[in-house]
Each structure stands twice: as structure tokens, then as C-alpha cells.
Amino acid sequence: MGTYLDEILDFHRRESRGDTRSLDALIEKAGEVKPPRGFNKALMSSPVNEMAVIAEIKKRSPSLGELVSDLIPSFVSQEYEKGGASALSVLTNNQYFGGSSMDLREARAACSLPILRKDFTVDLRDVCDTRIMEADAVLLIAAALDDHELKDFIALANELEIDALVEVHDEDEVERVLVVGAQIIGVNQRDLQTFEVDTD
């Protein structure tokens, strides 16, 4: 029986196979975007002994359904910034989370915080798209990618001068992503295969 993750990845990989855009052209276009704000730098510059908060903008989820029907990214991003967030995470997946690239652009235009594009990255073109929509970091999910993909995606993110946040769920995945060069690691308490949450 397939999981939420399997279904979402199948959808994105099908879309990727139908994407005929030139990778070289996308890399060139991504290089023309204004400089990133420094996602990792913002997290690391949080005052000593204070937690750096990545505040999230999400309209819905596969497991919980609609979360906020009238969410306004510009307003929410400003409120998060006023509240002391170090960075933002914006869902751009429309099919399963109700997000869009416009949500990210709107949030970024309304505040000065660096932004993580939270989506399912399955192709090098996705990394380019992340930069083209002016995000400052790309999300890479260890459970969704093999070592070769992780290494290539991190390398391209570095080339485009954006940060890569690599998401893991357990210690084995931590060891895996460190080997391929992950610099920022996020721990998801939710197992993306079962969608169960483990708070231990």
C-alpha cells in the first residue's frame, strides 16, 4: 500500500519527466536573480542561547486538510518578522498543500527575512526554480532522494548561492546526509512514510 510520500513523489516525478526545459538555460536564468538573503547566516546569527525560529506559511496538508482558508502570505510574513522569527518556510506545492510560487514571492516582498522554499525537490530543475522564484534556501528530503541526487542537488544549490536544508527523520538519515555534504540538517518528527509523529 502506498504512503502519502509515495503518492506525492510519484506526482512530482511524473511532472519532472514531462519537463522539457533546458537545465543550462534555467541555471543561467537563476544566476540573474537578485542576491539571496542568507538563510543559514540568519539562523546562525541568532543571539547566543536563543533559538532561531523558522516560521511556516502553510494553507493545508494531506493529513489534516485545510488549515487556513484565507491565509494572506504578505500579512503573515510581516507578523512572523515582528514576532522575532529568523527565517520563513513557505509551502509552494499546490496539489497537496495549496501553496504556490506566488505565495513565496508575496511573503518575500513583504518582509526582510530569508525564505526556505518548502516543496518536494526531485530534479535539478526544481533547484533552479527555487532560486528563480527568489527563495534563499531549498528543501531536500532525505527519504525522497538517493545519495547521488542529494549530492548533485546540494552542489547545484551551492553553485546558485542558496542554502540547502536537508530534512531527516532518524539517525541513519543523519549519517547519510552528512556523508553527501549536508550543511544544514532539519529533523522532522513526522515519519513521512507513515505520517506518524515521534516526539522522543
Pin down the residues of each PLM region:
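Non-cysteine beta-strand/loop elements that form the S-adenosyl-L-methionine
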Residues: I54-E56, I141, G186-N188
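Alpha-helix-loop-beta-strand connector modules within alpha/beta enzyme cores
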Residues: G38-N49, F97-V122, A142, L150-E167, ...
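Alpha/beta enzyme core
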Residues: V68-L91, A110, L124-A137, L150-A164, ...
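An N-cap/entry alpha-helix motif that binds or orients negatively charged groups
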Residues: G2-V68
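Glycine-rich beta-to-alpha transition loops that act as phosphate-gripper elements at the mouths
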Residues: E56-R60, L67-L71, N94-G98, R117-R125, ...
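Glycine-rich, proline-tolerant flexible connector loops at the mouths of alpha/beta enzymes
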Residues: D24-K34, P62-V68, S86-E106, A142, ...
